[in-house]
């Protein structure tokens, strides 16, 4: 279930004759002056006295709110074609949109990687491409360090989704599994989406085979082969959370 924190809020619902200068209610003060002068038979706004002054007084109330941070991670290596990125972008867009409906506040962190990972802007996340090999664990490591430092689990519901074609350095697959198991101690949910475009190899990657050994109810995987699989991926990733049908 979603973690809730108690937030302090203020509402100015009352007016009093004494208060802080910065809380002076000019409109109510003018009305009091006008009312007093009319009762004296001297209508108009003039001759201000202390008894005319009205100040806004804050009422404090507390609200239980839910906050979420979403880590979206994408493989930037040369094998991630424009078509594969399009599928990843579509899933990411709807993930963020749904979570913004569920939570009071949602922050999104974009992480891109080839053999090394970095936090990037949304524009770069979807627009840039890099060459070279792929070391997916670099992204999971950056996300783990970042959430521990900036988004404590006592205050945030942390979601993480990673999209790759699974063409990972072979000896890194076990490291990925270990990093995900670490992240599951910090995250509300971790998801891995493997993108297999129509003309690429359709068999699941060695990375996905390694990740299938993670037996955890909050770790989900799916394979996307065409744009038509986007809805199925959303059901796999979000159905239990927000009733995607």
PLM features: residue spans?
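Acidic, glycine-rich A-domain
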Residues: 21, 29, 49, 57-71, ...
